[in-house]
């Protein structure tokens, strides 16, 4: 069975595209952060997601590795979508969402990046009152998407996976969902 990583920066609509795509396809949708949290809670290391950041880096690496292994094991019986981030923007710079020790355990077959124009993402972010998102310029949004592309290609180089970009433009959700379905079938 396949392991497909789907990622997009906040406001790209990756979750919306994914939810609509999976209504018609037989994939198990797994959020990588949720699996990490489950493992850390089972081990008695944390009680909630916010406490994950406070764990020593080596413990976090062990949890990341265990989460990737757990997801790969699930793929023996199901096609898996891993909903995660290729890169995480931090005050210190961009952090890889899938370090090599995760990729070695996860063994993804494909990376799908959901993107939109910077203007569309900017507008979506400021109009979404349900989320507390950082305000970024159009150039910063473009840079984040470029970093995702670079990271996805680096990940693909390490794993032999392919990289597909699905555009999710305003008022064209059906088109993005159709393209995503054709990639996953």
Curated annotation (Swiss-Prot):
Compartments reported by the entry: Cytoplasm
Residues reported to bind ATP: 8-16
GO CC, alphabetical: cytoplasm
Entry EC number(s): 2.7.4.3
Assigned keywords, A-Z: ATP-binding, Cytoplasm, Kinase, Nucleotide-binding, Transferase
Keyword Transferase: yes
One MF annotation (Gene Ontology) recorded for this entry: adenylate kinase activity
Keyword Membrane: no
Record's catalysed reaction(s): AMP + ATP = 2 ADP
Family: Belongs to the archaeal adenylate kinase family.
HAMAP family: Adenylate_kinase_AdkA (MF_00234)
Name assigned to this protein: Adenylate kinase
Organism encoding this protein: Methanothermobacter thermautotrophicus (strain ATCC 29096 / DSM 1053 / JCM 10044 / NBRC 100330 / Delta H)
GN (gene name): adkA
């Amino acid at each position: 069975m396949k392991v497909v990583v789907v990622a997009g920066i906040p406001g790209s609509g990756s979750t919306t595209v994914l939810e609509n795509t999976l209504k018609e396809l037989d994939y198990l949708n797994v959020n990588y952060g949720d699996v990490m949290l489950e493992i850390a809670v089972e081990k008695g290391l944390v009680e909630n997601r916010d406490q994950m950041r406070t764990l020593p880096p080596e413990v976090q690496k062990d949890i990341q590795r265990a989460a990737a292994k757990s997801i790969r094991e699930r793929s023996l019986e199901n096609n898996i979508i891993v909903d995660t981030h290729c890169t995480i923007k931090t005050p210190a710079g961009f952090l890889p969402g899938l370090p090599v020790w995760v990729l070695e355990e996860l063994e993804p077959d494909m990376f799908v990046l959901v993107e939109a124009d910077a203007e569309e993402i900017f507008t979506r972010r400021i109009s979404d009152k349900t989320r507390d998102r950082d305000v970024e310029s159009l150039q910063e949004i473009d840079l984040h998407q470029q970093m995702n592309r670079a990271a996805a290609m680096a990940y693909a180089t390490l794993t032999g996976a392919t990289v597909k970009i699905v555009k999710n433009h305003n008022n064209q959700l059906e088109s993005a969902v159709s393209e995503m379905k054709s990639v996953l079938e």
